[in-house]
Amino acid sequence: MLISDTLRFMGAGSDSSPETIELAETAIEKVRSVSTPVSRLTVINSDNKELLRGADIEKHLCGCSKAFVLIATLGPGVDLMIRKTQLQSMREAVAVDAAASACLEEYCDEICAKLAKSNSITMRFSPGYGDYPIEVQPQLLAFCGAEKIGLTCSGYMMIPTKSVSAIIGIKDENYEELNR
């Protein structure tokens, strides 16, 4: 899955040349060698109109009185690697950037899989999806204590760039408190 996602993010297909597949595999190895994935989860009431604005997030959280707010990052080493690689080879930089995106998705999927073991959850829903405004990003990060994992926001862009914020609804019938 990781290799196919990396190829997809590179704009390549599953019928890619052996050279392209090798480029993607090498990029994944490079990203994993510098990646320091870390995340924070916080529970929020789904009626929090300050952080959960818009009809789309309201619809997404239908049947959920609570939700997880997830923030996750691969760490600053990945951003640095992408920038350094851009100076050497844009072809490799595209692959490294794609691999980083795929690794971040994989990390978030692993977190969601753990949550799903004890909760019935929705898919992730991030600021900028539908009418859920990207402008809520700084408030979500503050709500989760993003500074504790080295995650900040410039405008509405997260730093490090290979980072995610997302809302994950917790279906009412299966809500279980976080053991933290």
Task: Report each predicted region and the residues it spans.
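Active-site helix-to-loop segments that bind/position phosphate- or nucleotide-bearing substrates
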Residues: 1-88, 92, 96
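Context-gated lysine
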Residues: 30, 49, 59, 66, ...
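Short terminal or interdomain "cap/linker" segment that borders an active site or interface and mediates
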Residues: 121-180
